[in-house]
């Protein structure tokens, strides 16, 4: 497998001058992790935040959204896997994102697939453990709404102006893929603070 993202967190920088209350700053790695709605357990998002990657004070926010298509009770599962990305700003606890979908692939095999924009949304956090993903799809589904998010994996490094995070090395965490089957891959979260490893494929 080839690695497309490597990040090492050496320190957590607090932007207390521009952050209000306990809302977290989106230009920090600490929001990276697994998030879900307990009422809809079995689906959720894997979030990656790369601080200052776009420019000083501007992060790359990207994620994978594991969910399902609408189906009658008892019908066959119809999984849906979307990806999204946007640019987080220092001093802001929300970020607009574009939602993408890859279609036409095969399990762990060719062909390579390309992402197609199918909607937009806003990812917002009230604190280091709770957030909301609002979405509007522009494809034929016409779906619109929002889903609450609760942190699934333990918080280690997320910081606000009232609650600093701790340092941790997440060097192996990130997105991994095989170039021959680009359009699919795994998200790896290695959390040294909680001595846990989570992999989504």
Language-model regions: role of each:
Residues 1-8:
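Bacterial N-terminal signal peptides that target proteins for export
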Residues 21-201:
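Mature soluble binding/inhibitory domains
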Residues 16-18:
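N-terminal signal peptide c-region/cleavage motif recognized by signal peptidases
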